[in-house]
Amino acid sequence: AVIGDAALLKAQGVPIVEVMAVSEAQARFATALPVIHHPLPTPVESGRPDPLNAPAVADGIELAVSLAVSGEASGVVTAPIAKAPMYASGFRFPGHTEFIAELTADAPYAGTRGPVMMLTARDLRACLVTIHVALDQAPQLVTAERIARTARVVHESLKRDFQIASPRLAMAALNPHAGEGGALGLQELEILIPTAARLRAEGVDISDPRPADTLFHEEARRTYDAAICMYHDQALIPVKTLDFW
């Protein structure tokens, strides 16, 4: 079911039917989009997000997550949010990923906690070490701890959620040519390579940093089950190039 303003969706010409619970949704999909009505306080003009509606948008995300945590829903599919009006309203999270992590922080979970953003396209799974940060901030945030946590979460998820018995991870380098032996940056020598070695000692099958410009072509993708990427566009450019909607 969609959690949203039923009147707004209906005005867009979308055939909808209001439902009171997620359990009612499956029987309705054949004829209309099932909607759990979650009204917005201010009229919406397409293409002009209003900060006055931002708290209701955040509340809708929180409601969806609560339904998943309680078991009423099997999962949550998020739609894009306009971040600038969200921030203007006082929303303090960089994006969905971090907000959902906060909402689920107290939920029972035995594995390594993220959050980790994984995006998939065809045979590619790309996972981010840094997420919604400016590019000039990303290198400072590419730490051994963040890389290791991301790799552990992905390793566990591939086994649990994708039934891959022995996951293979490819680490994308931060710098061009994987740093060229230190000539184009020291992060590979000082952070990425030692972290990969420690992870392998733990039983995580992860490569040393590989140049990102040759990591995502078809033949390369056959050599790993997920790529551990250092920053946002390093992961999202190949994903959206392969399968853009």
Cite the ranges covered by each PLM segment:
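Contiguous, glycine/small-aliphatic-enriched amphipathic segments in soluble metabolic enzymes
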Residues: 1-98, 141, 145, 149-230, ...
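Alpha-helix boundary/capping residues
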Residues: 15-16, 107, 133
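A generic local secondary-structure boundary/capping motif
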Residues: 24, 105-107, 115-119, 159-161
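A generic secondary-structure signal marking the coil-to-beta-strand transition
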Residues: 31-34, 114, 125
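Glycine/threonine-rich beta-strand-loop-alpha-helix active-site module
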Residues: 87-116
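Ligand-binding beta-strand-loop-alpha-helix segment within the catalytic cores
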Residues: 117-141, 145-149
